[in-house]
Amino acid sequence: RNTTMQNVKKLSRTAAAFLLAALILICSTVLPNTGTTVSAASAELTSIGLAEHALKAYRDGWQYSYGAYGNFNSNGVRASDCSGLIYSYFCWVDDNSNIQPNWNYPRTVTAQANDAVESGPIDTIPRTHGLIVTIANYDHVGVYVGNGMVVDNSTWGVNMRYESIPGHGWLQWHKL
């Protein structure tokens, strides 16, 4: 009789765990009262999204072109300058389309740094992916992607880089 009761309790716990898991799954994929799925909601701009965008640009081999912001060049490769890499995140359409400019977002390094909600010296950088980092006089900008690493689109012939924070003379971090 004890064995039967133990089996019933075990079955009840298993059923309760299954129902709880199903409820969590349902709640995590549909936002309340909107019917919007999480994947659609993730289109919102986030610091993590900016870091992922920069890493994708690095992996895809974007080329450097002064004044460009992520559109395809004549070779079919995306191109940007340093601030254009960040600006392209704000205006992204999809992997196969050119960027659609939205001048409500900051385009230049100075505008991006001035638009920050928080800033500090590089030696105080929080462990927050997607911060932007700048050098002296806001002459260059990159994206902090975690683990002490920055992605930036550097200059002609160098293109995208993935390097440690001390590697380029970064002086400040900024949270957009």
Residue ranges, per PLM feature:
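N-terminal capping segments
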Residues: 40-98, 137, 151-153
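Short, Lys/Arg-enriched N-terminal segments with co-localized hydrophobic residues
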Residues: 1-4
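Bacterial N-terminal signal peptides that target proteins for export
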Residues: 7-19
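Generic recognition of cysteine residues
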Residues: 27, 82, 91, 129-133
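Bacterial N-terminal signal peptides
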Residues: 18-29
